[in-house]
Amino acid sequence: MTTEDTFETAERAAAIAKAAALIESLPWLKTFHDRIIVVKFGGNAMVSEELQRTFAEDMVYLRYAGLLPVIVHGGGPQISAMLDRLGIQSEFRGGYRVTTPEAMEVVRMVLTGQINRDIVAAINKHGPLAAGLSGEDAALFQGRKRGAVVDGEAVDLGLVGDVIGVNPEAVLAQIDAGRIPVVSSIAPDIDEPGQSLNVNADAAAAALAVALRAAKLVILTDVAGLYSDWPNRDSLLSKITARELRELLPGLESGMIPKMAACLAAVDGGVEKAEIIDGRIEHSILLEVFTQSGIGTEVAPV
């Protein structure tokens, strides 16, 4: 066999492998065609330019493949960095960050004016596909102040809230127009008109997924998935039911509780499946949606 023959054989094998990968996605293309998938964008993927680029590519691929992606994002590290840059001291009470009116101005500026714009711009490099929204727009989210109890005493966290209602019309209008909605995790305070609240992006994504009757909620994290016995790496769970997660939730590492609670809220609210996946892996969304094995941890109703 000549060198040229060897090269052609290698090329043919590579082409066949690519075709096999495409065919593997066929059942999922059928399953999720014209279905909404809510993706919570966060973690290291938000601060790595390369991961931002591949995330944007994944969203564009989903849209052109006939799926209906919706993005919800937070921005804790970027908010902290901007507060430090502006010389605004962060206040903590019982381990919780207090969001003062001054800090809330920074939260709005960073989430809606910086991060949201950056995500939209990254997607729109591939065409006029993405449209930015704030949770304040058309009262998309409705929030109520959240308190905390520390050492038996009530603690005022300032302008921190929970999402207690969703008006999905603004998002649905963007979907109907063929766009990818990108939503920042801010909510108007229903008890104090004109006031905005900083809400947890995982919880906001779950609430929106329920309101949109999404087929799937995907939360990007900085770990491979849920571990039943962290830090034992062999305890990674590929799948867990809502009942099993409800039992496991109180004992989880604190950073995982909001994410897994969001997954639980989503499936309890009618979302068919929820996943946490490792956002540090390039094209992690495509690997999760379009491969048989998927990645991360899937939460199923039963």
Swiss-Prot record:
Domain of life: Bacteria
Keyword annotations: Amino-acid biosynthesis, Arginine biosynthesis, ATP-binding, Cytoplasm, Kinase, Nucleotide-binding, Transferase
Residues annotated to bind substrate: G75, G76, R97, N198
Recorded family membership: Belongs to the acetylglutamate kinase family. ArgB subfamily.
GO MF term list: acetylglutamate kinase activity; ATP binding
Reactions mediated catalytically: N-acetyl-L-glutamate + ATP = N-acetyl-L-glutamyl 5-phosphate + ADP
GO CC, any one term: cytoplasm
Protein's name according to its UniProt entry: Acetylglutamate kinase
Pfam families hit by this protein: AA_kinase (PF00696)
Function: Catalyzes the ATP-dependent phosphorylation of N-acetyl-L-glutamate.
Pathway: Amino-acid biosynthesis; L-arginine biosynthesis; N(2)-acetyl-L-ornithine from L-glutamate: step 2/4
The protein's Enzyme Commission number: 2.7.2.8
NCBIfam families xref list: argB
